[in-house]
Amino acid sequence: MTDTAVKKSAESVKMPENGKKKHLSWQVIACVCLVAVSVVLNVIAWKSTAFCDWYTAHVFPIWENTYGRLTSLLPFSFGELLIAVAVFGIPLSLVAMLVLVIVRKGKRKKTAKIFGLVYMWIVTFVVTVQTFNCFVLYHCSSFAELNGIPTEQHTRTELEALGNKLVTEINALSKEVERDSEGKFVLTADLDKTAQEAMRGLGSEFKNLGGFYVTPKAIKCSFFMSQMDLMGIYFPFSMEANYNQDMYKAKLPDTICHELAHTKGYIQEDEANLIAFMACDRSDNADYRYSGYLAALGEVRNKIFDYASDDKKIEFDSSICDEVWADMEANWDYWRSVDEAKDTVFDSEAVGEISDKAMEKSLKLNGVEDGKQSYGRMVDLMLNYFKDKGEL
């Protein structure tokens, strides 16, 4: 063999390694670029409401109509699977990496590099998806601004008028739904197509609410959701509207519509509450109408009770019929049973406290200054909504 032949042979052996290095470097570049784009989008989102409105109307629907359609085909919550993989898979992979680094002495650098790339892609995926499917949405114009609903301060008299209106409606609706031998609500409606139709029906009047809707998915490990005080959750990593199947069933239709509102870009909790109420209120299904009014009554009742005298509280509560009270108390009993549950994998009080702090922190980091208290702003939105319609 000649010297030239030997050199060519050596080069042919080295080329795959060089090629691999180039491949790895491109992965790093790709991740850095995606994270950089995410950072830029977040900066623009905080600075420009107009950009966020444009993004929500024209770009965000692309993810729903592609990725959302794909995950909707699955008969289970893909988001729940991703959480399971993250909770169990990542710690196990760290253990596997340490074992391989110890055992494969001659390939420690290569092993660390492979696992490093995997973790780098995971971080990139989280940052990018959270930005595209969640963070930007927090900085849009409000639902009221987008849809021409006036915003103004309201008197206690108007609040009490709204409360009385809700009581009148829900008392009548309570006679239209099925009940068991104990007088408690029995769900007869489906939790997917009816919810999608109810939400889609708002599309002709309100921006961004028409078109395709993802399929709502029940969470298998719903008790853990209950420990976190969650009735539903929009999961941006799977573009899914997930719900707690263990909770009291009268609350499910409204909860599902609430999560579907998030998949249309309305990420603020108070706005999703209002949208869910409107969808349920306009639904042809009695279960949905009842669920919407039950959720709304709870919010308005809490607002009235913030200032009302004992006599006024008694007067208001006495106007609510026995059937509605049966459902309100059954709902409270469920959440109380979760708090008092024994022999659970995780302590309910500890899980609830961690979840509450995490939610509060997340909301404030995304510009929601009053954190979880923002949920209660739904009452102000309802007052504006009904007043704009001339019904208050």
Locate predicted features.
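Pan-zinc metallopeptidase signature
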Residues: 329-392
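Auxiliary, metal-adjacent structural segments of Zn-dependent hydrolase domains
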Residues: 178-245, 249
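Membrane-embedded alpha-helical segments of integral membrane proteins
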Residues: 37-100
